[in-house]
């Protein structure tokens, strides 16, 4: 039965670019977005509007589907709230795009859902961003909140995630999309390999339009009964009537190819690299092939699971067999120093082999697989895009093959193939997309006599099916075969063995006592003691630091003053060049000593320990005639008041008036600082003590200031009259991106935002034309200078506060004042502490307590006494029951929670009622632990070490805050290196002075905890326990050992003084003048 007669004839999706009337509908868009859209993108928006906002935008990857979806959703903004469903790794890039193109949205109006219980802001936010990973069967609280919100406009990015009818996320999303009035589905590969993958997406947009699933499968999937032995199965993996399906899809789907609408984009050149494997490498694979051939001769001899399991095993064996050749190929490509390229693989074993090749070549790289957190992936992408020293990106086809941009690469290498052409094309177009300026060469490494040859044929057959369905014509992966003689060296590659299969560590692979007790560095005999040397050379270091800053101004974040850093410097760092990575500093500007070439080659950049001194101007600066501030000699304007160098001395009255004005502005800034959201709990002393001092401008700011008049277009008199002049501005930092939103001094939104790094690079396109005026521009420059002087942790504290502020430094002080002082000598909150707080709350205010657990096992005696089916335990006698309840709560897997007299469960953190007022299901009790995401985060930071490390790593990325060493990168390099090379890698770095057992443990089983720790700025012994993020910092292992030893020494001195005071008086008291 054909459904074609029941569907209206398709409107032509390709709207003429010359028809200006078609674009009049787009006048509603923000000016910046409308000016940025390309003609075919405007056609896509018009196509959706003609279909009342329900369609699929299926443009090929890299054609800008995101901005089209934002434009469509903006047309229906009166019908918001808007729900955006994306892969988990794309939540923050989507938030960045929303803030960029719709600047009228304030930061608090965009909600990025963090976990399955983060539902507090769904009902109040205009835009909600949700990751596919949270749509699981146990996310009942989240699913209920999404259904109750009744979203009228929904965007589903990478909608092919809904391809499976049986997947949980497909069943959850289907009713939400169907119920929405407007629904935009985005995907570059609607069908990855078969027509059956289209049905759920079509059903979400237009239910029953293509009939039931059975009707659709029979008509377009060639559905039939297939027998495996004696068992029958309904097979829907085929394809039929594809031309008819293509015609029907054109009514609800618009699809353009890059070759049709983006002809100026450089071409994509595919090439197959076939090679033969050495017989030793393919030994296991050959035996599996023989087993597979036996099954194929007698199809009744094995079940489907046996066949599929064998194919999966052969797939992995193919990866291991060709890994040695892949390593040699990558090393060959690395011989070209100017080449940046991507390497895609599927199995972890192949990813490991590719990583080893890069490490052995001593090249800087990034690696993204399923274990890398979503927030860290964006950081790694930016590193590859902007750092010229990072030449290779090793990527998982599934984890990094969608949504990310790697246009800095000109070559793509597929170390492995995958099962469908959709994933392959998605991975190809990470580099071949808008923004690519060079042709992209794609190399497929095909090992003859392996599963590769079969998979290549299968990929081309599937490509013909998807091409006929989506594009109306048969297609295949056009790839020319490379010169076989050119790649003959691959067949002589050595067989590769994964680390887990490698032989036991031999003695020569570990450090020994003899090596650790080798002679001291001869230079140490000619140097005084560390503290004496520090005093003698402090002036010289300051002068050298000032000279360095004069030539190449350093990053203000990395040159922040730390008074006790020299005391904590380990001997290994004083006598030996360390290999650390500083992407912001060119390699030619980083000092290297002779004899440290190995360290330089191993870690890419050789850099001396960062000097932590306050810039001192020993007579070489110039004094401002306006404010008398002594500036660096290279600055053309005063750093404090923006007065030009050499300017006339102002009149006294004018000076006094200006000073009074500045004083009033400072007072106003403290009075008018507006609180949008309460800040996190923490220690005022830490923030107040660590407020940064003014630092010298960075190179970008200097160049911006010097060339301001030259680069800024000179407006006419009429424009000058129309542009407003601001004497002060207010700012709000986005919680989820790097953008800063701009407000007037009255707190009114200016509908614009910017990224501080763009301003430092003299990119002002995100700000209105009125910021061409020097007075307006100076306000932004001053903010960027202060913001850049803060550490990443302090910036995060301001972001979390949600405050409106004039100065980030003053905002940090305000946050410190608002925080309650808390002193605790306990490192973490325990279950006993929670139980005691709950019992005290009930004792004082009434109510009862209950023990909440996550999925308690039936018949568990530890929970039966307190909890039956999620019910509460009434509070009886606090004098007799408290001790027993607390004891049993500490030994169980749950928490003792207080419930008030009205039946509302109270938050474990703040003892306030949570958002869950009525518990109807067992799962709700566990989800009602916290009243908000803020309380949940604060509780886990204070009680869970793994969560604490993850949050600090998200901000500081494993970089030591004392010596600026990238300890996380060293850990990844050592973890991914062959075991035989780990010893030499460690011996060339700062870790060489660590204890013997610790070094050998790093070689045997390296872990993050061996390389960096999360340290309390105010120590736990001094009352800094159970703290928030503001009292935490990342330290490498050497700095942490030194700081811990110093603190132990100080505590010992305090104890001795306290003991001595019990038996006598301090003699220094007699020397004090009365």
UniProtKB/Swiss-Prot annotation:
GO cellular component, as recorded: nuclear replication fork
Span(s) of short sequence motif PIP-box: 519-526
Compositional bias per record (Basic and acidic residues), positions renumbered to this chain: 662-674, 696-711
Residue(s) carrying Phosphoserine: 566
Family: Belongs to the SNF2/RAD54 helicase family.
EC number annotated for this UniProt entry: 3.6.4.-, 3.1.-.-
UniProt entry tagged with the keyword Membrane: no
Designated name of the protein: DNA annealing helicase and endonuclease ZRANB3
UniProt miscellaneous comment: In contrast to classical helicases that unwing DNA, annealing helicases rewind it.
Source organism of the structure: Bos taurus (Bovine)
Pfam families registered for this protein in UniProt: Helicase_C, HNH, SNF2-rel_dom
Domain Helicase C-terminal: 325-481
Chain intervals annotated as zinc finger (RanBP2-type): 617-647
Keyword Zinc attributed: yes
Ranges in a coiled coil: none
Complex and partners: Interacts (via PIP-box and RanBP2-type zinc finger) with PCNA (when PCNA is polyubiquitinated via 'Lys-63'-linked polyubiquitin).
UniProt-listed InterPro entries: Helicase_ATP-bd, Helicase_C-like, HNH, HNH_nuc, P-loop_NTPase, SNF2-like_sf, SNF2/RAD54-like_C, SNF2_N
Residues that hold ATP according to the record: 59-66
